[in-house]
From Swiss-Prot:
Pfam families: ABC_tran (PF00005). It comes from the Bacteria. It comes from Azorhizobium caulinodans (strain ATCC 43989 / DSM 5975 / JCM 20966 / LMG 6465 / NBRC 14845 / NCIMB 13405 / ORS 571). Residues 1-38 are annotated as: Disordered. GO terms for molecular function: ATP binding; ATP hydrolysis activity. SUPFAM superfamilies: P-loop containing nucleoside triphosphate hydrolases. InterPro entries: AAA+_ATPase, ABC_AA/LPS_Transport, ABC_transporter-like_ATP-bd, ABC_transporter-like_CS, LPS_export_LptB, P-loop_NTPase. This is Probable ABC transporter ATP-binding protein AZC_3926. PANTHER family: CONSERVED COMPONENT OF ABC TRANSPORTER FOR NATURAL AMINO ACIDS-RELATED, LIPOPOLYSACCHARIDE EXPORT SYSTEM ATP-BINDING PROTEIN LPTB. Belongs to the ABC transporter superfamily. The keyword Signal does not apply. Keywords: ATP-binding, Nucleotide-binding, Transport. GO terms for cellular component: ATP-binding cassette (ABC) transporter complex.
């Protein structure tokens, strides 16, 4: 996926708050929603009553969840449980049949993916999304050209991101020459160039050597210390449970359980249906 397409043609990053911007889309006729809006805390990304069917088969039914700024939340479950569909409905890649997605209490359900990105919902796909024909600094700079019109501030922000993610030494390197861990750091740094309030990470441990797992975990923790809310879906359960604050376990298209990692692992139902009786953190 070309990440610039998430912002739309000739798009610029919104400088007002997500709530104010969502409201402006409503005024322009691009935003629709129910007359009744439930109370939702500022600084949250939430889904309510999501449902999705394919060919008459209901794969997601009445799933609700929330992520607050500064916390990491896992979206986990067995293959075919519906977790990926839920995740893609939140990103905007899949349209929900029922339910809604709210950012800071404002309905963003009808918005395409690029508008959600402009409001502050970042997305890092499972497959490599790096621009292979560009250098590291040009990868990050491509997004900064959209989000920061001032050339001097753009250069300063580029230097800061390279330093923050410890990739200054490869700034001139072609992206195709990076290791798996370096590539992930570049992708996350580039995602942060869009100044998201929330990051949705799809299989962040996929294609990563075991030695780099701790590096990715540290990067996710770094995002939360920045005040960014993180939603992760991944098949590497142990690694994911080792870094999140809470998790939602999806089974047969519904939320089987929500809780902290210790509560999840201790649940007889979760162990029986998903983790197995011998699972340990």
């Amino acid at each position: 996926m070309n990440v610039l397409s998430m912002f739309g043609r000739n798009a610029t990053r919104e400088t007002s708050s997500p709530a104010a911007t969502a409201g402006r889309y409503a005024d322009e006729g691009d935003w629709e929603g129910d007359d009744h809006q439930p109370a939702t805390a500022e600084g949250s990304l939430a889904a309510f009553g999501l449902a999705k069917s394919y060919g008459g088969r209901k794969v997601v039914r009445d799933v609700s969840l929330d992520v607050r700024r500064g916390e990491a939340v896992g979206l986990l479950g067995p293959n075919g449980a519906g977790k990926t569909t839920v995740f893609y409905m939140i990103t905007g890649l899949v349209k929900a049949d029922q339910g809604r997605i709210e950012l800071d209490g404002h309905d963003v359900t009808p918005m395409p993916m690029y508008r959600r990105a402009r409001l502050g919902i970042g997305y890092l796909p499972q497959e490599a999304s790096i621009f292979r024909g560009l250098s590291v600094e040009d990868n990050i700079g491509a997004v900064l050209e959209i989000t920061e019109p001032n050339r001097k501030r753009r250069a300063e922000e580029l230097d800061a991101l390279l330093e923050e993610f410890k990739i200054t030494h490869v700034r001139k390197s072609p992206s195709i020459a990076l290791s798996g861990g370096e590539r992930r750091r570049v992708e996350i740094a580039r995602a942060l160039a869009s100044r998201p309030a929330f990051m949705l990470l799809d299989e962040p441990f996929a294609g990563i050597d075991p030695i780099a797992v701790g590096d990715i975990q540290a990067l996710v923790r770094h995002l939360t210390t920045r005040g960014i809310g993180v939603l992760i879906t991944d098949h590497n359960v142990r690694e994911t449970l080792g870094l999140i604050d809470r998790a939602y376990i999806i089974h047969s298209g519904t939320v089987l359980m929500e809780g902290d990692p210790e509560s999840i692992v201790a649940s007889p139902d979760v162990r029986r249906l998903y983790l197995g009786e011998e699972f340990r953190l």
